């Protein structure tokens, strides 16, 4: 994400072009990009935590691994959004080495998504701790 390179001063009257540039940058803060996963395994990367929706469509079980902070330096409060798009299959979210997951799922440390259009957010709550919320089993 980049913002206008112009430097503005107090009391300056901005041109329409300058205002439009600022508006475009602000709009881009809310625009999601997509990453589609069709395979059976995925390890989250830093870029996944910024305005991204990861879609999973495999008909079998897809395993998502949350890596520890020495591998991927997610900031506290980082959110990774995931969506199951396939009609069949399951998404299983697992802990990388040293990672702790909590959720309201049947197995709190290994939440799964089974429903079509089931979505969840993985939130880093500190250190190597993550909470998974959403439509999980």
Protein language model regions, located:
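Short, intrinsically disordered N-terminal pre-domain segments
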Residues: 1-20, 133-137
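Short clusters of hydrophobic/aromatic residues that line enzyme substrate/ligand-binding pockets
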Residues: 3, 8, 64-66, 113
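Exposed extracellular interaction/assembly regions and N-terminal maturation sites
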Residues: 18-97, 124-137
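Short capping/connector residues at structural and topological boundaries
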Residues: 8, 13, 49-50, 71, ...
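Terminal beta-strand-rich extracellular "head" domains
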Residues: 96-116
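Extracellular disulfide-bonded cysteine-rich modules/repeats
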Residues: 115-125
